[in-house]
Design a protein with these regions (language model features):
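Extracellular disulfide-stabilized recognition modules
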Residues: 1-43, 112
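Surface-exposed ligand-recognition segments of extracellular binding domains, strongest
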Residues: 66-105, 111-115
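Conserved helix-loop-beta core of C-type lectin(-like) domains
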Residues: 15-17, 32-87, 127
Length: 131
């Protein structure tokens, strides 16, 4: 793990928080493409569970200057957002008025202020993976 932290820590699109490493190479895709990319790399989509993790993802998001996908969604049960492992979200950072499910929005994007918005899963957003 120490070698991974050293390698990723030197990368532009990488941040380390505790035992987690967040990484992006600037690739964008829809939610399913992002999920597949992160899973195929041995990780999962970035899914902040506290403010420090959210800030790490925000730094990467802002380096690329585009909205980023987060791993949480309410695809299974509308209005019940969950982490990729199926557990309920324990940390919330919704933008005011969100989630609002405007237009069948089941996925979550991060704005440039670190706040979250529910978003249509078919839109393209920055892919950030968590290891």
């Amino acid at each position: 793990m120490a070698a991974l932290k050293k390698a990723f820590g030197a990368s532009k699109g990488a941040r380390i928080v505790g035992d987690k490493i967040y990484v992006s190479d600037g690739t964008q895709g829809n939610y399913n493409a992002a999920k597949s990319a992160c899973t195929n790399a041995g990780g999962q989509m970035a899914s902040p569970q506290n403010n420090d993790e959210n800030q790490a993802v925000l730094v990467i998001r802002n380096q690329y200057g585009v909205a980023a996908w987060l791993g949480m969604n309410d695809i299974v049960t509308e209005g019940s957002f969950r982490y990729p492992n199926g557990n309920p979200i324990i940390y919330l950072n919704w933008s005011p008025g969100e989630p609002n499910n405007l237009g069948d929005e089941d996925c979550v994007e991060m704005y440039d202020n670190g706040k979250w918005n529910d978003k249509s899963c078919g839109d393209n957003r920055l892919v950030i993976c968590e290891f």
